[in-house]
Structures are given as structure tokens and as C-alpha cells.
Amino acid sequence: MKNTFSWIKKEITRSISLSLMIYIITRTSISNAYPIFAQQGYENPREATGRIVCANCHLANKPVDIEVPQAVLPDTVFEAVVRIPYDRQVKQVLANGKKGGLNVGAVLILPEGFELAPPARISPEMKERIGNPSFQSYRPTKKNILVIGPVPGQKYSEITFPILSPDPATNKDVHFLKYPIYVGGNRGRGQIYPDGSKSNNTVYNATAAGIVSKIIRKEKGGYEITITDASDGRQVVDIIPSGPELLVSEGESIKLDQPLTSNPNVGGFGQGDAEVVLQDPLRVQGLLFFLASVILAQIFLVLKKKQFEKVQLSEMNF
């Protein structure tokens, strides 16, 4: 009886350990793949050259647009609208080799002091325009750099960021100046992972010249292509994942770096910039006072002119 209980206890412990291991592996896999690879490998998403690092993985160049107010007052919430246009009818190759809708993502690089507006400061009208996307800071110490994605492109090809402007009265590092804002936006999956390996959303080239002596279609998708050097019989096997369409056939002579597959990528990355002026309220008040003074001066001038004309008219009648 004691041995039976001991055996049951051992099996339960083994099952719990196995379940925990599977959970950890699965959890790690998900976290490594979602959402922003750039956060894992780069301290700052914008290089000294001005290039945003997302372009290292998303090789195709596509447009992106950003719209912000020309000027904002301190300690106010405004909208930065990022548009990531693409053809809604196209499908991309997913990680499992099947076709699916495109996802989108964006990184917004704000000036120091600007940050994501807290929910309590966002008006109901703005909340309705924003929807319910999940924004996050690029780093806990970099609240001025915001990222989102991947999110469904059908719903979020236009992303509205609620931004809180800083107040120079409380933040001495901020001044009433014109500031640049940078944005990067992608649609679809990348072609290269941060470790340099290829995804299945890109073209695969021959790693050797020779004759395609054998093509094996793998059970779970993809191909093994054996290339034989005609001069010495040396063989090289190129592994093609599920997704790209095969372009070569057995017996075909190929060159080094010749495409073995089509390029399935239908997405791409783009970057842009805009400018916003942090406006001094006193300057605005001064401008309004000046305009009011000009308008009043014009009114008095018109009244004085009419009064003068009346005097002239009365003298002529006299």
C-alpha cells in the first residue's frame, strides 16, 4: 500500500513538472515573438543616421504618414495620428506557412518630456477615436518613445496616439520651442529575425551552384533541395520553410545566389517625421491682445473717418 502511494506521488510530481516545463517553454516562445523585436536588441530605436531599426527586419520600403497639430499648449492632451496604408485585399504568409491578414505596428519617437496621456486626461470623444489598442513605452525610462503592435491591420491601419505635452513651469529641461517627432510603421511580418535568421516571409537563394539533384517535400511543409556540384559531386542541402513558392525543379542547373523561391512578402516598413511647437500661453495672450488692439484701432479709425466726413459735409452745406 505504501509503495502504491509512493508511486502515485512520484507520478503526480512528474506530471506537474512536465506541465510547468511546457508552460514555461510556450510562454517564452510567445514573449519572444510578441510584440516588438526592436525592444529586445536596441537601446534606442532611432540610430544616429536617423534610420529606425525596424528597417533591419522589414526590408521592403512602404509609406507611412503622421499628422500632429502645428502647435500645442503645455500640459495639454493632443492627438498624433499615424497612418499605415496598404491593400486590404492582400494576404501575407503566416509563421505556419498559411495565408492570413496583415498585422501592423508602429513606433512613435516624441521629444523628451512628451509622453502617453494618462486615461484620466483623455476626453470621451478622443477615447472613441483611439479605440482600445495597447500602447507601451519602449523602455520604462523612455516614456517619450511609444510602441504598438502587432495589431490587426484591418482595424488599426490608422492609429491615434493620445499625447500629453510637458509644462516648462514644472520641467526645467523643457522649453517653448519647435520639436521634431519621428515615426516608423510596418505592415506585415518581417523578413529577418533579430538573430539574423530568415523568416518564411522572404525569398530563399541557392547557397551553391550546380544541379538540383533532389527535391523533397517535407511532411509539415517546406522543401529540402539538394544541389550537386557537377565538377566534384559535392552536395549542399538548402532548407526551405513552408510559405514561399518553389521556382526550381529537379535536373535544373542553377547559379550561386539564384532565387529558389518567390518572394512572398506583401508588407513593408516606412518612416516619417513631423514638427510641433510647444507654445507659450503668455505669448498667445500677447498675440491676442495685439490683434485685439489692431482691430480696435481699425474700428476707431473708421469711426473717426466717418465723423470727419460728416463735419466736411456739414461745412459744405453751410
Swiss-Prot record:
Instruction: Report residues binding heme.
Output: Y34, C54, C57, H58
Task: Give coiled-coil spans as residue ranges.
Answer: none
Q: Where are the transmembrane segments?
A: 284-303
The cofactor required is: heme
Gene3D superfamilies in alphabetical order: 2.40.50.100, Cytochrome f large domain, Single helix bin
Q: Where in the cell is it found?
A: Plastid, Chloroplast thylakoid membrane
Tell me the leader sequence span: 1-33
* Domain of life of the native organism: Eukaryota
**GO annotation, biological process:** photosynthesis
Q: Name one GO molecular function term.
A: heme binding
InterPro entries associated with the record: Cyt-f_TM, Cyt_f, Cyt_f_lg_dom, Cyt_f_lg_dom_sf, Rudment_hybrid_motif
CC cofactor note: Binds 1 heme group covalently.
Q: Which UniProt keywords apply?
A: Chloroplast, Electron transport, Heme, Iron, Membrane, Metal-binding, Photosynthesis, Plastid, Signal, Thylakoid, Transmembrane, Transmembrane helix, Transport
Q: What is the membrane topology listed in the Swiss-Prot or TrEMBL record? A: Single-pass membrane protein
Give the principal location in a single coarse category: plastid
Which proteins does it associate with, and in what oligomeric form? The 4 large subunits of the cytochrome b6-f complex are cytochrome b6, subunit IV (17 kDa polypeptide, petD), cytochrome f and the Rieske protein, while the 4 small subunits are PetG, PetL, PetM and PetN. The complex functions as a dimer.
As for family, the record states: Belongs to the cytochrome f family.
Functional description taken from the UniProt entry: Component of the cytochrome b6-f complex, which mediates electron transfer between photosystem II (PSII) and photosystem I (PSI), cyclic electron flow around PSI, and state transitions.
Q: What is this protein called?
A: Cytochrome f
Q: What is the lineage of its organism?
A: Eukaryota, Viridiplantae, Streptophyta, Embryophyta, Tracheophyta
The coding gene here is petA
